[in-house]
Design a protein with these regions (language model features):
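Domain-level recognition of nuclease-like catalytic cores that cleave nucleotide substrates
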Residues: 176-237
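Conserved catalytic cores of phosphodiester-cleaving nucleases, focusing on short active-site segments
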Residues: 106, 131-144
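Interdomain/boundary linker segments immediately adjacent to catalytic/signaling cores
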Residues: 22-110
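Catalytic cores of nucleic-acid endonucleases
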Residues: 144-197
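Short glycine/proline-enriched coil/turn segments at helix->beta-strand junctions
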Residues: 111, 135-138, 167
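Active-site metal-binding core of divalent-cation-utilizing nuclease and nuclease-like domains
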Residues: 115-134
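Short, Lys/Arg-enriched N-terminal segments with co-localized hydrophobic residues
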Residues: 4-28
Length: 237
């Protein structure tokens, strides 16, 4: 069981330092419980989608002919298809879960903050830009991972950041896992420079986890590790 003494969290906001220990501990336990329930919801949906997709794949194996031409047996082809489709669903739901769990941490500690759309004052497409969590002047974007290799992504993000700063907000990008492909990494490096150029903030990898901990007082990574350990231990019983 984790208990946080706010005065011992380096860099934690002044607002959080003023919270009595028992009140903050109650907030922490409430967040952990909500994240557990959120994980239950995503787990159920994920496994349901995977089961449905496997059923659909059994009804369409005609393309195995091409696999066999390329030296892949029917059995190998089936496993490859299953893992590929399972991976797609897992990636999708893992990302959505982490982003929603992060938002839970923010909203529980800063209930006045919320998801917000602001008009695009620099163009017609898109008409609006969404801010994942707007708290005061902090415009926080939450990404579990951004693996895009599309150069247009930089142009769109540049416009988005300029619109946000023009509205009087500070753009803050939080991305927990860095992409692996060279082109995607290059794009992230460009985005980091972009945020720095407008006095915004860019956090990726370990820095993203630390930012959430400093901003909310909640060690989200530790919460997730606790839940993962509890579920792994339960599955091994």
């Amino acid at each position: 069981m984790l208990f946080f003494v706010l005065l011992h969290i380096e860099g934690v906001s002044a607002k959080l330092r003023k919270l009595p220990y028992l009140i903050f501990n109650r907030i922490y336990m409430a967040i952990k419980d909500k994240i557990k329930k959120l994980a239950d919801k995503y787990t159920k949906t994920l496994h349901s989608q995977i089961a449905q997709r496997k059923k659909e794949m059994k009804d369409d194996t005609s393309h195995y002919l091409i696999y066999r031409v390329l030296g892949i047996s029917n059995e190998e082809g089936q496993l490859i298809d299953e893992y590929q489709n399972t991976g797609r669903f897992l990636y999708k739901y893992a990302g959505s879960f982490l982003e929603e769990a992060t938002t839970l941490c923010f909203t529980e500690v800063y209930p006045e903050g919320c998801k917000t759309k602001i008009p695009n004052t620099l163009g017609q497409k898109p008409k609006t830009f969404e801010i994942d969590f707007l708290n005061g002047t902090d415009a926080i974007e939450i990404k579990w991972r951004d693996a895009t290799t599309d150069g247009d992504h930089i142009t769109k993000e540049h416009t988005r950041v300029k619109v946000i700063t023009g509205a009087g907000f500070t753009p803050i990008r939080v991305m927990f896992y860095y992409p692996q492909r060279a082109q995607a990494i290059k794009i992230q490096e460009t985005l980091e420079t972009l945020y720095s150029g407008v006095n915004g903030e860019y956090y990726a990898g370990d820095y993203a986890w630390e930012f959430v901990k400093r901003y909310t007082g909640i060690d989200l990574k530790q919460v997730l590790e606790e839940i993962a350990y509890e579920r792994t231990a339960s599955n091994n019983d």
